[in-house]
Regions:
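Extracytoplasmic beta-strand/coil segments of soluble accessory domains associated
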Residues: 72, 76-114
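Conserved C-terminal beta-signal and adjacent last beta-strands/turns
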Residues: 8-13, 26, 187, 237-240, ...
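Structural signature of Gram-negative outer-membrane beta-barrels, strongest in the C-terminal barrel
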Residues: 241, 330-336, 340, 344-467, ...
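Periplasmic-side early beta-strands and strand-to-turn transitions of outer-membrane beta-barrels
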Residues: 159, 166-167, 176, 191-270
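Gram-negative outer-membrane beta-barrel transporters
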Residues: 373-375, 464, 485-566, 594, ...
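N-terminal periplasmic accessory domains that precede
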Residues: 36, 71-74, 94-97, 109, ...
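Short acidic/polar hinge/loop motifs at secondary-structure boundaries
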Residues: 114-142
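Outer-membrane beta-barrel signature, preferentially recognizing the C-terminal barrel domain
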Residues: 265-282, 286, 404, 409-410, ...
Length: 632
């Protein structure tokens, strides 16, 4: 505890010194960080300096220097985010733990559209199914944000913005090869023809990999679990006239993988086939002082498990319709508001339980007012009313004042509520409970973002989150077990980030994140952040070795964790202590010509032997290399 206080005190001291000298520093050009424009935090384009929340951006430039990596690998190096299973087999589920919250409490968006899987137990989407090659940038919004985005935005929002056509029509080819017989090929086409933009990407990935399950002591190696992924992305835009544009998108994905029976348990004939289609159409109407947006999307997922002839078929379908208005009343007041409708349905068949046919709907309306003054004071006030076809109505709010000094020092406070609705499985399956209420959360957050010079940035944020009606598996009635609202979860922590550019050719970003949490059940109160470290820190270093050669060094320390797994021999749940580990990766890129880029990525340089999930393996020292060729 003393160490935590000393960290905060030191950062506040630096902030005080910076503010005392703000008049001198205000004459310098502000760093790009606060001037960067994002859309996720307010549902309309705003500079980060105007937003009283923690926003982080993975830019197109960063992704361009991550060729051959995966989306989970890139997200894992953001302060306060741990991707469970990041170092495991690609077929393993990747769990997004933001600020210590469960994976279901982080909302994933693609181009602003909520991405869920109605066929899964808790409804979250596996981000390993999203190829990094279709992504232009990623905006990460931390804290409770259900007022703007509805269910699941309890710990934060990750908005994956896909590539759109710009410039002259051109093609590109990417190919990689690496450890574990891993290969990937990408063919892309992008550009603009008069008033029409188009982006088309086709991706094929294959890997023989290694056994997901770790062999128990005294057992020989298990068989390899392969992974195969095929994906297609199509984005089309049409500028109809000076005020109105339309867009359409199609993302099709198929994953085929070999699975194991569980922790320390192999399976020779267990396969998984996941296919998904996300299609949408939308439009933007420019008004005199704002914009009117509409989006209609359809998200269909099919999951098929075949375990030695025993077949499970689960399908999930989500229809989502949304209309948003952004309006500028004046230089001081902006309005964001909208209405949305979502229908979820699932059909599930397996040999072990009754067939499941279920659906429900969620309707909501929200509004958010943004105020700014010439003195630097800014505030956002918002609310959302939600109506669920099963449990009824609930309300969320946001109160978010901030203050901007000298265009480069930002202080903020954020008080908000958020919620997560129970999934179709939790409501209607053999273990379902129609009396379930949504999980409801209240969050408090405060911090600062200080740009001392154009080469130095320091940020600190503290958060506290209280979730009631936590959905758990327990006894509903005599001799009946299922899902029930019975727990209360309390989490808190802080994050520190320091960005430096000591030389024009060197960029450094260091971070430290701390989180702790306890759950209160009818029996006791205990720490329960399974698979999530209390402490994590890292350093990302970018070095331009020459005009054509760049080097990125990526280091992350993941602290001690605890885990639980089911022991198939004793038929009991076992708790395991997972030790801390350090990961060091190196990525080097050579721009051979204006159109040809060569790259190599070496991961786990220290060949660290570590565990992310008890009973499962992770990768040792591994690499991939490849090229990207542009064709006009």
């Amino acid at each position: 505890m003393k160490r935590k206080i000393s960290y905060v005190a030191a950062c506040l001291g630096l902030a005080q010194l910076a503010l005392l000298d703000s008049n001198a520093l205000a004459q310098q050009r502000p760093v790009a960080a606060l001037n960067e424009v994002v859309v996720t935090a307010s549902r309309s384009p705003k500079k980060i300096s105007e937003i009283g929340k923690v926003v982080r951006v993975i830019s197109a430039e960063t992704l361009a220097k991550s060729q051959g990596r995966t989306l989970p690998e890139v997200l894992n190096n953001i302060a306060g985010i741990t991707i469970g299973g990041n170092g495991g087999n690609p077929a393993d589920v990747k769990a997004v733990y933001m600020r210590g919250a469960s994976a279901a409490n982080t909302l994933i968006l693609i181009d602003g559209i909520p991405l869920n899987d109605a066929s899964e137990i808790s409804g979250e989407y596996n981000i390993s199914a999203i190829p990094i090659d279709i992504i232009d940038r990623v905006e990460i919004l931390k804290g409770g944000n259900s007022t703007l985005y509805g269910s699941d935005a309890v710990a934060g929002v990750i908005n994956i913005i896909t590539k759109k056509g710009t410039g002259v029509l051109s093609a590109n080819v990417l190919a990689t090869a690496g450890s574990y017989d891993t290969y990937k090929q990408v063919l892309g086409l992008t550009g603009q023809i008069q008033n029409t933009t188009v982006t088309l990407n086709a991706i094929n990935s294959d890997s023989k990999n290694f056994s997901s399950a770790a062999p128990a002591q005294g057992v020989t190696n298990f068989d390899k679990d392969g992974f195969h992924q095929k994906s297609v992305l199509l984005n089309i835009g049409q500028q109809v006239n000076t005020r109105f544009s339309i867009k359409g998108n199609l993302q099709a994905n198929n994953n085929l993988a070999d699975l194991d029976a569980g922790a320390f348990s192999d399976a020779l004939e267990y396969t998984y086939n996941k296919s998904s289609i996300l299609a949408g159409i939308g439009g933007i109407l420019a008004l005199n002082k704002g914009t009117l947006n509409f989006n209609l999307s359809q998200n269909n997922v099919k999951n098929r498990y075949n375990n030695q002839g025993s077949v499970t078929n689960n399908t999930g379908n989500i229809t989502h319709l949304e209309t948003n208005l952004n309006y500028n009343f004046s230089k001081s007041i902006d309005l964001a508001g909208g209405v949305s409708y979502k229908k979820l349905s699932t059909e599930q068949y397996n040999p072990y339980s009754s067939a499941l046919f279920a659906d429900n709907t969620i309707s909501s309306a929200f509004t958010s007012l943004f105020f700014r003054t010439q003195t630097g004071f800014q505030a956002e006030l918002g609310g959302r009313i939600n109506n669920h076809s099963d449990y009824g109505t609930n309300f969320t709010y946001t109160i978010n004042p901030s203050y901007l000094f000298a265009e480069r020092y930002k202080l903020f406070v954020n008080l908000s509520s958020a919620y997560r609705v129970p999934s179709l499985y939790q409501l209607f399956s053999d273990y379902g409970n129609l009396a379930l209420e949504p999980e409801t959360a209240t969050s408090f957050e405060t911090g600062f973002d200080l740009n001392f010079t154009q080469h130095t940035n320091l940020s600190l944020s503290y958060f506290k989150r209280d979730i009631e009606n936590v959905i758990d598996f327990g006894q509903i009635a005599t001799n009946k077990f299922g899902y029930i609202n019975q727990n209360r979860q309390k989490d808190n922590g802080f994050e520190i980030e320091l960005g430096l550019k000591p030389l024009s050719a060197i960029s450094l970003n260091a971070y430290y994140a701390y989180v702790t949490g306890k759950v209160t059940t009818p029996i006791n109160t205990a720490f329960n952040l399974f698979r999530r470290p209390k402490n994590s820190y890292g350093l990302n270093a970018g070095i331009e070795l020459s005009e054509k050669v760049s080097l990125n060094l990526i280091y992350k320390h993941t602290g001690d964790r605890i885990d639980r797994y089911y022991d198939g021999k004793t038929f009991k749940t076992v708790q395991a202590d997972l030790g801390s580990f350090n990961m060091l990766d190196a990525y080097i890129q050579f721009k051979a010509t204006s159109k040809l880029i060569l790259f190599s990525d070496v991961k786990n340089l220290m060949n660290e032997d570590y565990i992310e999930f008890a009973g499962y393996q992770t990768k040792g020292l591994n690499f991939n290399a490849g090229f990207r060729l542009g064709i006009n």
